[in-house]
Every structure is written in C-alpha cells, then in structure tokens.
Amino acid sequence: MSHTIVLLQTTMGKSSRTFMDYESVNQAIEGICNMYEQRLKQERPNQKNITYDISQLFKFIDSLADLSCLVYTSHINAYTPYNKEWIKTKIINHLQKLAQ
C-alpha cells in the first residue's frame, strides 16, 4: 500500500483548494468516485438510486480546476505526482475490477 494524497481545486479560486489523504491508491480512487457520487446526491436529493456512467464521471473530473495525486514511492522515499489522465486510467482499472 502506498500512502496517497489527493490534491483538489474545484474552481480557479485558491480558496477552493483542499486535500484528502488515503492509505492506498485504490482507496484514493474510491474516494474520488465517492466525491462525485456525493455531489450527484446533493444535486438530486429526491432520487433514491443514483446512477452514472464513466463519461459523466470523467466530465466532472475535467470540470475541476485541478485534481492530482501524490503517491508515496518507498524506493526513492518521496511522493510521485500524477495528473488527471493517470487518475482516469486508475478509475477505469478500478471499475473493471469491480465488474468482475
């Protein structure tokens, strides 16, 4: 497991910057998906079941001013940065594993 920090900026304003930390990349990816699901629940409070497809999730990710991950790499004793495209790839892999 590699400690992972998710850096998030929802708008261009610096005040929208925040971070979340997780014990692993998988937990971070689940956290990002959960963040989108929570947003959908807020937008549709009367809808009992929330469904979405991956293109909607990716559109949400692209709408964020910034989303990146810092993943701890033990052999260099440092955090390695990853961008939105890497996150999207990890989401695809994560969802494929869930579908099996």
UniProtKB/Swiss-Prot annotation:
Alphabetically sorted, this entry's keywords are: Cell cycle
Q: Which Gene3D superfamilies match?
A: Enhancer of rudimentary (3.30.2260.10)
Q: Which domain of life is it from?
A: Eukaryota
State if Nucleotide-binding is listed as a keyword.
no
* Cysteine pairs bridged by disulfides in the record: none
Assembly behavior:
Homodimer.
Q: Could you tell me what this protein does?
A: May have a role in the cell cycle.
Q: Tell me the protein family, please.
A: Belongs to the E(R) family.
- Name of the protein this chain belongs to: Enhancer of rudimentary homolog
Source organism (scientific name):
Dictyostelium discoideum
What would be the name of the gene that encodes this protein? erh
